[in-house]
From Swiss-Prot:
Activity as a function of temperature: Optimum temperature is 52 degrees Celsius for amination. Exhibits prominent thermal stability, specifically a half-life of 23 days at 30 degrees Celsius and pH 8.5.
Residue positions of the active site: 90 (proton donor/acceptor)
pH-linked activity: Optimum pH is 9.2 and 10.8 for amination and deamination, respectively.
Organism: Bacillus thermotolerans (Quasibacillus thermotolerans)
CDD domains: NAD_bind_Leu_Phe_Val_DH
Catalytic EC class: oxidoreductase
Name assigned to this protein: Phenylalanine dehydrogenase
Regulation: Activity is not affected by the metal chelating agent EDTA. Addition of 1 mM Mg(2+) results in 15% increase in activity, while the enzyme is strongly inhibited by 1 mM Fe(3+), Fe(2+), Cu(2+), Zn(2+) and Ag(+).
PROSITE patterns xref list: GLFV_DEHYDROGENASE
């Protein structure tokens, strides 16, 4: 009996140790629909937590917990970098997105989200689609990134790609002293929703591209697109993209692509792309700096989609989204300059900026002004 009690206490201690940086972790279980989900709220200093919901057949609950804790913390930094009044959150549904989905499952998930009373807003991520969240919307108002037909801003890959292009302009300026996108060659990994749009825009500017993707149709399409532009496209094997000679490596597919194995192969001057968590560890950021490779922090350069979904809660306004997305240029350039000034990596400079912004904004958000409600309460009316 004593042994059982001791084990339980130790398990509780381990769980709280894992979530020591987080405000709240919610385990959601609905046996009728098969829903097993975890919602993690990292920090709400800037406002309610915001983050997508992914569905994945995790091997264990612990694996799912590790993922949602890591991703939600990353969202706190991403929201701070994008200067939106939201904190970091994330949700994961444990299950196979090909076989385990149902309208009832997402309605059940929506009910759990609604039970948080506006502390958490969510939308699509890996393994989930907007069709899934149309069902969740029947149970909660805290869904963002909805289709235009349902009052949302539409395809978030458009501002995401635009933000990457602004980041590439800033990177070109830092490398060559001018923003001209045609001035550089680019090795693009991934021609998905975002990567393809980035490649199209670069071709229109007349840039030289080296591309790879597992989808042969996407490769054929971008080659056909190149024929009507002054740019050029060369298709390379998936693993060869790391050793491809180019000015800028543009990862637009997987996370963790900058690691011990790939970092020695790189033959580029800079890395700037839309993929999340490009550095396997922060140490790899330091290794890039030692090699003289400029790195655009992923959560700054790919923030265009976040800017759009956060802006929905003011009411859809595409011009406002475009104006905010354009600021990614200044944010990337400032990060480069600050890192150089302080003798630190660009990722360390970005993290410092975000942490300072959260601390400074925290004082304003906790200063009571009488009749003026907190911003995030007002937004519940949209």
């Amino acid at each position: 009996m004593n042994v059982t009690k001791k084990t339980s206490v130790m398990e509780d201690f381990t769980l709280f140790e894992k979530m020591s940086e987080h405000e709240q972790v919610v385990f959601c279980n609905d046996p009728d629909t098969g829903l097993r989900a975890i919602i993690a709220i990292h920090d709400t200093t800037l406002g309610p937590a915001l983050g997508g919901c992914r569905m994945y057949p995790y091997g264990s609950v612990e694996e799912a917990l590790e993922d949602v804790l890591r991703l939600s913390k990353g969202m706190s930094y991403k929201c701070a970098a994008a200067d939106v009044d939201f904190g970091g959150g994330k949700a994961v549904i444990i299950g196979d997105p090909q076989t385990d989905k149902s309208p009832e499952l997402f309605r059940a998930f929506g009910q759990f989200v609604e039970s948080l009373g506006g502390r958490f807003y969510t939308g699509t991520d890996m393994g989930t689609t907007m069709d899934d969240f149309i069902h969740a919307m029947k149970e909660t108002n805290s869904i963002v990134g909805v289709p235009e037909a349902y009052g949302g801003g539409g395809d978030s890959s458009v501002p995401t790609a635009m933000g990457v292009l602004y980041g590439l302009k800033a990177t070109n300026y830092m490398l060559f002293g001018k923003e001209d996108l045609a001035n550089a060659s680019y090795a693009i990994q991934g021609l998905g929703k975002v990567g393809y749009k980035v490649a199209e825009a670069l071709l229109e500017e007349g840039a030289q591209l080296f591309v790879t993707d597992i989808n042969q149709q996407s490769l054929q399409d971008i080659q056909e697109k190149a024929k009507s532009t002054s740019g050029s496209v060369t298709v390379v094997e998936s693993t060869a993209i790391y050793s491809q000679e180019a000015d800028i490596f543009v990862p637009c597919a997987f996370g963790g692509v900058i690691n011990d194995e790939t970092i020695e192969q790189l033959k580029v001057k800079a890395i700037a792309g839309s993929a999340n968590n490009q550095l396997l560890t922060e140490e790899h950021g330091r290794q890039l700096a030692k090699k003289g490779i400029l790195y655009a922090p992923d959560y700054i350069i790919n923030a265009g989609g976040l800017i759009q979904v956060a802006d929905e809660l003011y009411g859809v306004n595409k011009e406002r989204v475009l104006a905010k997305t354009a600021r990614i240029y200044d944010a990337i350039l400032e990060t480069y300059k600050q890192a150089d000034l302080d003798g630190i990596t660009t990722m360390e400079a970005a993290n410092r900026m975000c942490e300072q912004r959260i601390r400074a904004r925290g004082k304003r958000n906790h200063f009571y002004t009488g009749s003026v409600q907190p911003k995030w309460n007002i937004r519940r009316s949209f």
